[in-house]
Amino acid sequence: MKQLLDFLPLVVFFIFYKMYDIFVASGALIVATLVALAFTWLKYRKVEKMTLVTAAMVLVFGTLTLAFHSDLFIKWKVTVLYVLFALALLVSQWVMKKPLIQRMLGKELTLPDKVWSTLNLSWAIFFLVCGLLNIYVAFWLPQDIWVNFKVFGLTALTLIFTLISGVYIYRHMPEEQKKS
């Protein structure tokens, strides 16, 4: 249910873009994000930090898009968000000495430190690559292609990378965890 709530604003953005334009879609994205955030809080009494960061970015960049009537801001949001995620992963590994991925999943999974580090670094690189891809698609291709890439391309890439990560984790799990 939480994943559906996280995905809902993106669907709203896509629908409003196809029906109207990037500015109406940006406004709808802000509203849908705030509604999803409120619903998540009311239902679970907890909102994940990543969701809060994403909502803050939507609010800031969406508002700038509307205030300056420029799609540059909403296009940059994706890259800035992905770079922030990558930086959080890298700082957790190199400065705080415990990968963020391990902090998030370590209670459920027992994996060697090297596996946690590799997984954490892989996700950081993934986010940086997606951020760079977004810059290319957003600023060198037509807006329609960027919207489709943002909604479907990045979602598909994230799903594929999640599956690859799952296979990698499974290969390194202790046998007793694989059985349960």
From Swiss-Prot:
The chain crosses the membrane at residues 22-42, 50-70, 72-92, 121-141, 149-169. HAMAP family: YciB. It holds the Pfam family IspA. The lineage of its organism: Bacteria, Pseudomonadati, Pseudomonadota, Gammaproteobacteria, Enterobacterales. The keyword Transmembrane helix applies. Plays a role in cell envelope biogenesis, maintenance of cell envelope integrity and membrane homeostasis. Its main location: membrane. PANTHER family: INNER MEMBRANE-SPANNING PROTEIN YCIB (PTHR36917:SF1), INTRACELLULAR SEPTATION PROTEIN A-RELATED (PTHR36917). NCBIfam families: ispZ, PRK00259.1-2, PRK00259.1-3, PRK00259.1-4. It is found in: Cell inner membrane. One of its GO terms (cellular component) is plasma membrane. InterPro entries: YciB. Belongs to the YciB family. It comes from the Bacteria. Keywords: Cell inner membrane, Cell membrane, Membrane, Transmembrane, Transmembrane helix. This is Inner membrane-spanning protein YciB. It is a multi-pass membrane protein.
